[in-house]
Amino acid sequence: MAITAAASRLGTSAFSDAPPVELRANWSEEDLETVIRAVYRQVLGNDYVMASERLVSAESLLRNGKITVREFVRAVAKSELYKEKFLYGNFQTRVIELNYKHLLGRAPYDESEVIFHLDLYENEGFDADIDSYIDSPEYTNSFGDWVVPYYRGFNTQPGQKTVGFNRIFRLYRGYANSDRAQAEGSMSRLARDLATNRANTVVPPSNSDTAFAYYTPSADVPPRACLGGSFGESGRVYRIEVAGIRQPGYPGVRRSSTAFLVPYEQLSAKMQQLQRTGARIISVNPA
């Protein structure tokens, strides 16, 4: 049964009928490999893992029955591989967002959760912060020792805040999307909404049939140009936001987003012009 009537448009169809991945008693080698792949996919944000990067020692302990799936998840989350992908070079709020997504399968509900983990990280370090997710009653009640963490924010569950449904779609950008391959890079996705206690808009992921890649800059980006047009339905104005324009006069690194206001009748021509400059169009919305 679909999570919502718009499951295909929101990119959640892959999770509609998929049961949780669990390592059951009397498992086969194929079952074990399925669990290991699921852990890497979930905990590493669907980022590609080379054979040389796999945690062979932790996999061996799981294979020999020395550790549980929960402990294997802990080993991956504390590994240098995880730190290189999601800790180093990321804003700390972004790290916390990803920890919630990877380890508890949801987004932070409010700023108090972020503050708790910021304090824990500052006072006790990264490993202690990871332990606080995996040893929490929420993790135990949701996954126990043998179930691989999965995205729970798409469904209504006991103790879940309604705003969590909106928030998860700022972190989840499609089944095939990687947490390291998004236009916003290392910036926090939820800091502003959490600070203002505001529910964000649910925007379909970039791989759906009706959505462009979604990007919200850390500070509001004013339009660089507004092209005049006629009034009326055909003259509706759209806001095009782009990154990576390779021309003199445009920011190359620090301010990666540039916005244009374009009337409907000029929209197609303007998009083609921008693409010829090497720009990546990251959102097109009515102004």
Curated annotation (Swiss-Prot):
Keywords: Antenna complex, Membrane, Photosynthesis, Phycobilisome, Thylakoid. Residues 2-180 form the PBS-linker domain. One of its GO terms (cellular component) is plasma membrane-derived thylakoid membrane. GO terms for biological process: photosynthesis. PROSITE patterns: CPCD_LIKE, PBS_LINKER. It is a peripheral membrane protein. It is found in: Cellular thylakoid membrane. InterPro entries: CpcD-like_dom (IPR008213), PBS_linker_dom (IPR001297), PBS_linker_sf (IPR038255), Phycobilisome (IPR016470). It holds the Pfam family PBS_linker_poly. It comes from the Bacteria. Its main location: membrane. Residues 235-287 form the CpcD-like domain. Belongs to the phycobilisome linker protein family. Rod linker protein, associated with phycocyanin. Linker polypeptides determine the state of aggregation and the location of the disk-shaped phycobiliprotein units within the phycobilisome and modulate their spectroscopic properties in order to mediate a directed and optimal energy transfer. This is Phycobilisome 32.1 kDa linker polypeptide, phycocyanin-associated, rod. It comes from Thermosynechococcus vestitus (strain NIES-2133 / IAM M-273 / BP-1). The gene is cpcC.
